[in-house]
Amino acid sequence: KIAPHRHNNFLIFRGVFWHTIQKLSLYDFYPTEYNDHNHYGPIFSLVIAPFAVVPDAIGLLLWLVVLALGMYYAVRRLPLEEGRQIFLYWFCAHELLTALQMQQFNIAIAAIIIGSFAAIEKGREVTAAFLIVLGTFVKLYGVVGLAFFFFVKRKPRFILALIGWSVVCFVAPMLISSPEYVIGQYVEWYERLAAKNGENTFSLMQNISLLGMIRKISGSASYSDLLVILPGLALFGLPYLRFGQYRHLAFRYAILSSVLLFVVLFSTGSESSTYIIPFAGIALWYTTSPWKRSGWDVALLVFAFVLSS
């Protein structure tokens, strides 16, 4: 028997499957089942299904094992020397443990972003498109995988795969429910995310990001986060103007690192368990940068580790 408060997130996740089967709202509050709301898309009902149909203890154990293995496999698929892969594992171990203790899908998001990059590097456009679409339809974060579009060798094939997988992910939950129900849940999903964004604004345990830092220090709720996000997007996009660098793997790794950092730094949903995503970016930045590491580089690495810990 597992204490309910210890695996609340997993209870929310498995509830997505059972509520889809029963055609109940995925975004209502069910205080007799778990605390908090679900914030994942309807396709998550199929992702979590294998772990929801078995007893809680077994499902939870398998869920954690699959999350950890997914991250391990994604890193192993990178065109990166084994020693650097091992460094990434050790550097991210603390954040991985934190996310595992909270049963969080953020581990899978990190794996999806890294995996989509690795697939593009290997010329597997269909696989990359699947990962990007799945991550987007589950938790939106996956959409940042489109940042690797300029590195895709066969762009028409990639675009067609994105469209095809989007159709599949949109209609797939209908197999265990109905078209009307699923379409209605997509509408509710948008409304729940909008509400959650407002709830996170001054939350102590949420919005642990650049957006949240500025918001909480200023104490102002009157301005739009776009005032911070748009300049951030502009800075993020500047490296893409270096067209001649696209052919260099070190440059592409720098973009991957930037993507992994950006998705959390500019999200109001950032919390402790999301930091597995940017930590992977920090480790990749340190191990793949083409210049000799300076004392400042080491200091930044240590600062990030200590700050998060």
What are these regions (language model features)?
Residues 126-130, 299-302:
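The feature captures the transmembrane alpha-helix scaffold of multi-pass secondary transporters
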Residues 94, 263-264, 283, 304-308:
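Alpha-helical transmembrane segments of multi-pass membrane proteins
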Residues 150, 154, 284-285:
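Interfacial segments of multi-pass membrane proteins
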Residues 286-309:
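Aromatic-enriched
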Residues 137-140, 168-172, 307-308:
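Membrane-embedded alpha-helical segments of transport systems
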Residues 1-127, 152-275, 279:
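Primarily membrane-embedded glycan-assembly and transfer machineries that use lipid-linked glycans
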Residues 132-150, 267-277:
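Transmembrane helices and adjacent periplasmic/lumenal helix-loop junctions
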